[in-house]
């Protein structure tokens, strides 16, 4: 996509693409002339405060979190008051980090190419200093980091405006010593800039934060905790999209397409499922605008931009392969401890207290798996949650289980005239569960009970319906599942029997939850460990609501 956009600019500054209208973009940096975007102005104002203060800092967020879009917009935002030099370390190959001499000459060459770009030259720097850098990097066989930074200091001293250096994908560097020495030079000039001219601000962008860059490159304990980038200011600017920001993007789309959508309602739905994760927001919108609209299931875009159209896009998103999900699942394989932590949150309802010094929590936060909420660690958003549930429920072991096969074989009877009979689902689950596991009660626990019901439910609704777990209700005793199927919604509470008093409170909680969803019927699946339990299914009248309860 980056190459495509570059070609368009070469052929007419984006006019050809503009003639086609703007679109939602999920590959490469976004351009407001070409793409529907959330307004970044407030974010840029906050980042500029750091630049104006002369801070060096890292913009570290998970993959596809809008970092590149932000720094490209920032470079444009700062250009009237600063000389902004924006580099991308992906343009420097691994072999060019082999030693300090090779890296220094490569960096100088890339630095000069960026400044002297014929189409977008960077002005305000002395030509004789640039020529000096060019000559030294080519002719001096001993040219290294020390000499590179002496000339860069001279360049900053003679520039017409303060110089800002931005490096995207800074953590793509692979040779530990060379990269750490580069950071050390930046640090040294920062600390001595009262007597040695230096960059006004240096911004590194990547997935890893300053401490974790050291961890990635030098995993031994001593260097992990002794980063040469310890001068960096804290970066606290919010990079996720707010519901208001999403609504602003949808207003621009609506002005072009007149779908009649409920903009605030749609923005709320998108935010509820994504928590403002930039790629997920844009991906859902793109799927609605293109794939769902062209699927033939909706007569026009007015029908697409509704809750049903939104859920259709969510279903597509949850079943597609993309680089974000591949990275997400890949990290579970790379870090077994992270996998165990995520599994415990999802299936056991374990409340994990946020501790920034705990390795797996740190990794989960860095890679975007998790967020901090009320002092605890939670999965970052609903889309990630369901994708992770699906991953754990789709292993070969899970799909070969008897309970999964029983659901697959029974699926046709649960769907009548396009409607899901949830009462029958619970009834058959009780029968199958009792038949399969009644002789293995000693091996059963709450965590397995939840997993087995989800194993049973998923093939029944797969391909047509969606589900998610209400994170606020998930704990070691209770979990609420929300199922959307062909325009109908079902609330199922999974809980462990803790006596009549607790059970009655659970019924009241479910009744209140039905109020929230404006539903008259709810479902409860109780796991009862008592020897004399009475398994089966019954209906309970709660005022004007009906509760279908199944006990296993």
Task: Give residue ranges: language-model regions.
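The catalytic "switch" region of P-loop NTPases
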Residues: 27-29, 174-273, 287, 291-320
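P-loop NTPase nucleotide-binding core
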Residues: 49, 53-65, 69-182, 200, ...
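Nucleic-acid nuclease catalytic cores
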Residues: 503-507, 514-542
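Walker A/P-loop-proximal flanking segment of P-loop NTPase domains
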Residues: 14-77, 150, 154, 428, ...
């Amino acid at each position: 996509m980056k190459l495509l956009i570059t070609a368009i600019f070469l052929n007419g500054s984006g006019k050809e693409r503009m003639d086609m209208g703007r679109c939602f973009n999920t590959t490469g940096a976004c351009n407001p002339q070409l793409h529907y975007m959330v307004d970044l102005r407030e974010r840029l104002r906050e980042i500029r405060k750091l630049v104006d203060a002369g801070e060096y800092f890292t913009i570290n967020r998970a993959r596809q979190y809008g970092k590149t879009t932000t720094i490209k917009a920032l470079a444009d935002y700062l250009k009237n008051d600063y000389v902004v030099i924006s580099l991308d370390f992906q343009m420097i190959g691994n072999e060019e980090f082999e030693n300090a001499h090779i890296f220094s000459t490569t960096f100088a060459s890339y630095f000069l190419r960026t400044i002297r770009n014929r189409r977008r030259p960077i002005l305000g720097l002395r030509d004789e200093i640039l020529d000096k850098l060019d000559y030294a990097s080519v002719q001096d066989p001993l040219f290294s980091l020390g000499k590179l930074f002496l000339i860069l200091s001279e360049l900053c001293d003679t520039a017409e405006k303060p110089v800002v250096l931005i490096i995207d994908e800074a953590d793509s560097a692979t040779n530990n010593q060379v990269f750490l020495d580069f950071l050390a030079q930046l640090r040294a000039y920062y600390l001595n800039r009262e007597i040695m001219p230096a960059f006004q601000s240096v911004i590194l962008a990547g997935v890893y934060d300053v401490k974790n860059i050291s961890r990635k490159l030098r995993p031994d304990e001593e260097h992990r905790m002794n980063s040469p980038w310890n001068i960096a200011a804290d970066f606290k600017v919010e990079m996720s999209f707010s519901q208001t920001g999403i609504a602003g993007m949808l207003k621009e789309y609506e002005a072009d397409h007149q779908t009649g959508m409920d903009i605030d309602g749609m923005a709320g739905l998108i935010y509820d499922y994504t928590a403002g994760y930039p790629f997920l927001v844009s991906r859902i919108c793109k799927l609605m605008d293109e794939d769902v609209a062209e699927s033939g299931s909706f007569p026009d875009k007015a029908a697409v931009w509704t809750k049903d159209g939104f859920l259709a896009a969510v279903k597509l998103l949850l079943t597609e392969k993309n680089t974000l999900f591949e990275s997400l699942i890949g990290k579970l394989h790379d870090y077994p401890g992270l996998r165990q932590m995520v599994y415990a949150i999802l299936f056991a309802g374990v409340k994990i207290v946020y501790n920034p010094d705990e390795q797996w929590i740190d990794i989960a936060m860095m890679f975007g798996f998790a967020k901090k909420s009320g002092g605890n660690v939670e999965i970052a958003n609903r889309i990630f949650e369901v994708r992770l549930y699906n991953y754990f429920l789709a292993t070969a072991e899970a799909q070969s289980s008897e309970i999964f096969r029983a659901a697959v074989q029974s699926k046709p009877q649960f769907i009548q005239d396009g409607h899901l009979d949830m009462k029958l689902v619970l009834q058959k689950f009780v029968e199958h569960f009792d038949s399969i596991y009644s002789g293995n009660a000693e091996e059963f626990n709450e965590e397995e009970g939840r997993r087995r019901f989800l194993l049973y439910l998923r093939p029944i609704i797969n391909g047509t319906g969606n589900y998610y777990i209400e994170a606020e209700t998930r704990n070691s005793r209770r979990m609420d599942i929300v199922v959307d199927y062909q325009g109908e919604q079902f609330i199922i509470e999974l809980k462990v029997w803790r006596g009549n008093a607790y059970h009655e409170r659970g019924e009241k909680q479910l009744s209140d939850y039905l109020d929230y969803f404006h539903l008259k019927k709810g479902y409860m699946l109780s796991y009862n460990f008592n020897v004399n339990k009475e398994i089966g299914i019954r209906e309970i009248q709660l005022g004007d609501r009906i509760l279908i309860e199944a006990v296993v």
